[in-house]
From Swiss-Prot:
GTP binds at residues 10-18, 29-30, 57-61, 116-119. A motif (Effector region) lies at residues 32-40. It is a lipid-anchor. It catalyses: GTP + H2O = GDP + phosphate + H(+). This is GTPase NRas.
Amino acid sequence: MTEYKLVVVGAGGVGKSALTIQLIQNHFVDEYDPTIEDSYRKQVVIDGETCLLDILDTAGQEEYSAMRDQYMRTGEGFLCVFAINNSKSFADINLYREQIKRVKDSDDVPMVLVGNKCDLPTRTVDTKQAHELAKSYGIPFIETSAKTRQGVEDAFYTLVREIRQYRLKKLNSSDDGTQGCMGSPCVLM
């Protein structure tokens, strides 16, 4: 069974835990209890493949920012979550993305931009803005509601598909026969 290490990042109060718990346990948590770090595992079938999702739900609060480098190192893909009624959380996405790229030492890291709380009538982040940001990053954008479950599976499953594409790309680039021992082609004798 293939395992995927997913990390949910974003500012405090955007609904990272609510999204994760909705996916794992099929229910909505409406009381806010700031997370330090929680880990969840769930077996799912995505596009016919049985997968084990290892999901790390992270702290949005600034006082836990020192822990970020560690989980960014181990994560394979990132759900970058903002709340559609919180412009600051949307602006913060760039900070998370830059930190992920720095820690991973790569511009090419599987990510999905997630606009949560789309069930709320008070929107301060326009869908068009979010689509444009995602397009500029070259990543998918999905609107979700942890309350109604809208887009929840789609967000996590899309991230798994992004990780699959990334793994294939890595496999193909290292499997083209040109790079062998010490950077030169290997010769079998």
